Amino acid sequence: MVVRLQNGLMGKVYLVGAGPGDPGLITVKGKTLLENAEAVVYDALVSTAILAMVNPQAELIDAGKRRGRHTKLQSETTQLLAQLAEKHAVVVRLKGGDPFIFGRGGEEMEDLVKAGIEVEVVPGITAGIAAPAYAQIPLTHRAYSSSVTFVTGHESAGKYRPEVNWAAIAKGSETIVIYMGVYSLATILPQLMLAGLGEDTPIALIRWGTCPEQQKLVGTFATILAQIEVENFQAPAIVVIGAVVNYPANLRQQLAPILGGVN
């Protein structure tokens, strides 16, 4: 038996993007929904500063997922959202970054719609754009790159096309942004090199992008794996590949004469 709200209607689920980490980057609409939510189900990468915006009277439930550590299975999360929508008018599913950029928002929306629940998507700033920006790496620049590809380094076994076509990406995009790719670089980089990218191709890893603890590791295809080991550089991190990675260093070099050699 399905229990409905007192007016006989189901509540509404809002898939809200929390942004990449800096609480100032959540949208006005997203913040307003958090302040008025009756229930919030949030992911692991949502910061405590964002969670502090939630209505103190709301149910607050952790559904976070990390590599190797799943608080709830995906099916359990969507079932939970459906149950919450039966008793609350405003339910927020709070996801890091943007719900529809490697955030499983599409899968959750599909399940909720099938259950007869109204869903609204509130986009967020994705880490693949924000982290490079905070690291002063422009993904496109007239002198460096006129194309960018966003790709996951962590494939789903059930996808209709089982493997990323790294050769096509290497040949078709001047900037490559990889989500969840730190632990897969040892297999990804050889495929990109087979497609024509050289060992001197610039690569940057940005950890905890937009947060105070943000870290950046810059190298080349030839050096980056050893650098990761030496620095013990851990996920989560965004990987940026292409000439744009060299932009900050080149800019400092150009400005040195103006600034008297000050970096």
UniProtKB/Swiss-Prot annotation:
UniProt cross-references to Pfam families, sorted A to Z: TP_methylase
Family matches, as PROSITE patterns: SUMT_1 (PS00839), SUMT_2 (PS00840)
UniProt entry keywords in alphabetical sequence: Cobalamin biosynthesis, Methyltransferase, Porphyrin biosynthesis, S-adenosyl-L-methionine, Transferase
Keyword Transferase: yes
Protein role: It is a step in the biosynthesis of both cobalamin (vitamin B12) and siroheme.
PANTHER family (UniProt xref): S-ADENOSYL-L-METHIONINE-DEPENDENT UROPORPHYRINOGEN III METHYLTRANSFERASE, CHLOROPLASTIC (PTHR45790:SF3), SIROHEME SYNTHASE-RELATED (PTHR45790)
Full protein name: Uroporphyrinogen-III C-methyltransferase
Organism: Synechocystis sp. (strain ATCC 27184 / PCC 6803 / Kazusa)
